Amino acid sequence: MLDPVFAQNKVLRHRLFDLVLNHGAPPIQQPQAGAPFTIVTSPTATSDLTALLNVVVTANEVTHLHGTGPLVKRVCGGWPNVFSIRARNDWGRHDFGDWNVCLSPRGRTRAEFFQNVLTVLRNRNVRNVLCIPFLADEFYTSIALHECFGAKLCVYLMDDQNVATHNIPDALVREFLNRCSLRLATHPELQKSYQDKYGLRFSVLPAVVPASLTARDPSPSLPSTEQRYGALIGSFWDQSWYDRLCDVLSKCDCRIDWFGNTKSPWFNLSPKHLRKAGITAHGVIPEHQLARKLAQYPFVIVPVGALDTRESNTGVARLSLPGRILFAIATSHIPVLIVGSEKTCGARFVKHFGVGEVAPYDSSAVSAAMDRMSRPEAQRRMRQAAAKIAPVLSDDGISDWLAKSIEVGEPADMRFEDLFSGYDASIELHSEPSIATAVGLR
């Protein structure tokens, strides 16, 4: 018997098709000023409206200003006829896709999501849908795409919003996952958590790194110096991370260069605190420059959650693996110092592969870790360990790998399963209530 949710979608589909996709409808036109949605078309996009589309659904802009953007571009690199759909604008810049649209104002009911999808894709044909979900919007939009166009649906989880924290309802996630022919996650803990909860197979696709930047041979160790110095990469996902790290580093007698987004729309990243901590902010720089810069340091700091009561959302922090960790070790083999809880995915990753150390938000512990990691023998050991796994983290051929995997409904090969063979993905979860109001849908 048809599940009531699917039955509801079937009714919506036929009703909206009659309204929006009837044969007598006029040809699709670009929305004019004041229209609900504006579709931005790339100068290189085909004019053939019968071309099969690869639709990519994200929460916000695909841009270099946050970690998701570069990764989305890498895994979809070279795909033809990409139509990028997002729920909202947060960064002021989007530079991805042959066509892109922001579905704002956001849908409030299931019917509105169906209508929005059919409005922007009227008279088009969709082959595949790649969904990188974070908000409820991405789930509903992807369900509508799958139902209305019969496209193959792939989910690529980069962050958790359902298992460790309940920002997305279980019923919605279950409906969405049941529709997916391929389910991917960036790391084993995220894979296992969703696999265990929903009884559906997930596979791993890590945050791959540009092949042109991947270092093949072990990089040389750097000579020791009297003053501690290193780099800082990654994002601050909670104000407490920033405050704690600045406080810790201010007592470590160190010089740190920060390469990352210093203008967060959500947190107060005080320049005064940076100066006191010995941190020089360089902002976001092109990845090829970042790879060269990282080769100049004995270690790189990546902040993660402390997983305590000072944080606003330990659930998201507990199940996330910062992609910049993989970027650093693959491009420069630089040892990684995780500052935060040893129970986070970042800490587990560096310990499993022997590419770094973990220290809590404590100045004595962080100073001692910096000193140990700067010693020649530690440099040699960690850089050799990084060199062993770097080639597997390359994005060489990854867009073809993903396209083929979506087509057959399983990983095209076992390269990533082999990489994480023997990896302990079990993780202690303390489920949290929602801290954000997902759109109230019915």
Predicted regions and their residues:
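Conserved catalytic-core segment of nucleotide-activated headgroup transferases in glycan assembly
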Residues: 64-78, 211-216, 221-290, 295
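Nucleotide-sugar-dependent
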Residues: 237-240, 286-292, 300-330, 335-348
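A charged, aromatic-enriched C-terminal amphipathic alpha-helix characteristic of glycosyltransferases
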Residues: 360-368, 374-428
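A short, histidine- and acid-enriched strand-loop-helix "catalytic/donor-clamping" loop
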Residues: 151-167
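N-terminal subdomain of nucleotide-sugar transferases
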Residues: 1-94, 247-252, 430-433, 439-442
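Donor nucleotide-sugar binding/catalytic pocket of nucleotide-sugar-dependent glycosyltransferases
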Residues: 178-216, 225
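Membrane-proximal helix-turn-helix segments that form the acceptor-binding/catalytic region
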Residues: 165-183
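An aromatic- and histidine-rich active-site surface loop
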Residues: 129-148
